[in-house]
Amino acid sequence: MGGLKKPKKKYLAGKPKKIWNKQLLLEELQLMGEYGLRNKKELWLARARLKWITRRARSLLSMTAEERAPLEMPFKEKLYKMGFIEDPNVQLDRILSLDVRAILERRLQTIVYRMGLAKSIHHARQLIVHGHVAVAGRRVTSPGFLVPRELEDKISLIQ
């Protein structure tokens, strides 16, 4: 039967190596204020997801054209469906130039605020946590929910 494995933290890939770097602290503080993040772990999760995307793009770039062909298009389509890129036919070099803002812009909290359903980014977070926001008719209470492109226009308020 064996013992259970201890679950790994998903944000460790995005956690900075030197957390007391002044420039990094100021940048993180600015991003937390702009996107209404509650703690740095939410920012580190976004960085970890971005790191996964760029690592995958770099590995695809290192392959030969024959090896890359069947893997490249599904990867680009997935990024397009999630809304991280604007066009599924972009070059892999453009995917490597993504930054953490591309991930943070797809969070439900940010989209609710940008749609004008909330007065501020913090108000958007409160509406979501209190269960006043539905995505495609289903109540979502996680402000960090990454909204796919197809569900973006199906966000509504529940009274």
Swiss-Prot record:
<protein>
    <recommendedName>
        <fullName>Small ribosomal subunit protein uS4</fullName>
    </recommendedName>
</protein>
<dbReference type="GO" id="GO:0015935">
    <property type="term" value="C:small ribosomal subunit"/>
</dbReference>
<dbReference type="InterPro" id="IPR022801">
    <property type="entry name" value="Ribosomal_uS4"/>
</dbReference>
<dbReference type="Pfam" id="PF01479">
    <property type="entry name" value="S4"/>
</dbReference>
<comment type="similarity">
    <text>Belongs to the universal ribosomal protein uS4 family.</text>
</comment>
<dbReference type="InterPro" id="IPR036986">
    <property type="entry name" value="S4_RNA-bd_sf"/>
</dbReference>
<keyword id="KW-0699">rRNA-binding</keyword>
<dbReference type="GO" id="GO:0019843">
    <property type="term" value="F:rRNA binding"/>
</dbReference>
<comment type="subunit">
    <text>Part of the 30S ribosomal subunit. Contacts protein S5. The interaction surface between S4 and S5 is involved in control of translational fidelity.</text>
</comment>
<dbReference type="InterPro" id="IPR018079">
    <property type="entry name" value="Ribosomal_uS4_CS"/>
</dbReference>
<dbReference type="GO" id="GO:0042274">
    <property type="term" value="P:ribosomal small subunit biogenesis"/>
</dbReference>
<keyword id="KW-0694">RNA-binding</keyword>
<dbReference type="InterPro" id="IPR002942">
    <property type="entry name" value="S4_RNA-bd"/>
</dbReference>
<comment type="function">
    <text>With S5 and S12 plays an important role in translational accuracy.</text>
</comment>
<dbReference type="InterPro" id="IPR005710">
    <property type="entry name" value="Ribosomal_uS4_euk/arc"/>
</dbReference>
<dbReference type="GO" id="GO:0006412">
    <property type="term" value="P:translation"/>
</dbReference>
<feature type="domain" description="S4 RNA-binding">
    <location>
        <begin position="106"/>
        <end position="158"/>
    </location>
</feature>
<dbReference type="InterPro" id="IPR001912">
    <property type="entry name" value="Ribosomal_uS4_N"/>
</dbReference>
<dbReference type="InterPro" id="IPR022802">
    <property type="entry name" value="Ribosomal_uS4_arc"/>
</dbReference>
<keyword id="KW-0687">Ribonucleoprotein</keyword>
<comment type="function">
    <text>One of the primary rRNA binding proteins, it binds directly to 16S rRNA where it nucleates assembly of the body of the 30S subunit.</text>
</comment>
<keyword id="KW-0689">Ribosomal protein</keyword>
<dbReference type="GO" id="GO:0003735">
    <property type="term" value="F:structural constituent of ribosome"/>
</dbReference>
